[in-house]
Each structure stands twice: as structure tokens, then as C-alpha cells.
């Protein structure tokens, strides 16, 4: 995966390629090769290898970028003036809408790559932690009755 600093240092062309790869991966990525991707994206193999040292690493970069995009979309849906329950609704609605475009082919291939599945699990755990913290805040403010928010 790309460190956030490295992501910020990407050229415009590299960002465009990663965006295009996200769209390509929607059709599934298990059978894609670096050479096939380079031909499809009209770029050199060297350009792809500058993004990641292997096909498997490139898969992780693209998946991680997609998951971060979903997370940013959800976080940006929260208005600082919202109460915790409204913020939770907005956050979960935005996250749900962001993942609604996930294709069966992408989900199938994601499940078949253990490292990509771990990335997905990590991002899901973060989403759950945000939801729990918003519920905890709602309990603290008296918006909802005291409950064990970790159980939800």
C-alpha cells in the first residue's frame, strides 16, 4: 500500500492511472497481469512498476486507495454541527452509498486475496470504531440510554 506521503507525491499521470485501475478492477482483477494492465491503460510496464514492485502489490495499492476513498466519503458526510446520532446516520449512509457500486467480480477477487481481505477488514474495523465512538458520545450526552456500544 502507498504511504500517505507517497500518495501525495504521485504525479498527475500516476493518480490518473490508479483511478483507471480502480475502474478496471471493478471487472475483477484475479486474472490481470502487469503487461495486460499496461496495454489496457496505454502505459509502459515501467510506469506500473513505479507505482508498485509487483502485480500483487499493485492490487493492494488500488484496493487500499479505494477503501480510503470510501472512508473519506463517509467522514466528509459528517457536519461538525451534527449531533452524534445524526452524524452516525450520515456516516453510515455515505459509507453504504460509497460501497454500493462494488461489483460481484471485485468482491469475489477481493475475498480471494488474503492481504486485500485483511486491508478490507482493517478498514471495516475503523468504520465500526467510528460508529462506536459516535454511539458512546450519544450515551454521554444522554441522547440514548446507557448501553454497551461495543455490543452493537
Which residue ranges define each predicted feature?
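N-terminal intrinsically disordered/low-complexity leader segments
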Residues: 1-15
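Hydrophobic/aromatic residues within well-ordered alpha-helical segments
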Residues: 13, 55, 62, 66, ...
Amino acid at each position: 500500500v502507498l504511504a500517505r506521503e507517497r500518495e501525495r507525491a504521485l504525479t498527475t499521470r500516476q493518480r490518473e492511472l490508479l483511478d483507471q485501475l480502480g475502474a478496471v478492477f471493478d471487472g475483477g482483477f484475479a486474472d490481470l497481469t502487469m503487461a495486460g494492465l499496461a496495454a489496457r491503460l496505454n502505459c509502459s510496464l515501467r510506469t506500473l512498476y513505479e507505482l508498485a514492485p509487483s502485480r500483487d502489490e499493485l492490487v493492494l495499492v488500488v484496493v487500499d486507495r479505494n477503501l480510503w476513498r470510501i472512508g473519506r466519503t463517509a467522514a466528509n458526510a459528517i457536519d461538525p454541527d451534527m449531533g452524534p446520532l445524526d452524524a452516525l446516520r450520515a456516516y453510515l449512509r455515505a459509507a453504504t452509498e460509497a460501497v454500493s457500486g462494488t461489483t460481484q467480480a471485485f468482491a469475489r477477487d477481493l475475498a480471494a486475496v488474503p492481504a486485500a481481505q485483511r486491508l478490507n477488514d482493517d478498514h471495516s474495523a475503523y468504520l465500526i470504531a467510528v460508529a462506536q465512538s459516535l454511539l458512546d458520545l450519544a450515551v454521554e450526552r444522554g441522547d440514548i440510554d446507557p448501553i454497551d456500544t461495543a455490543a452493537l
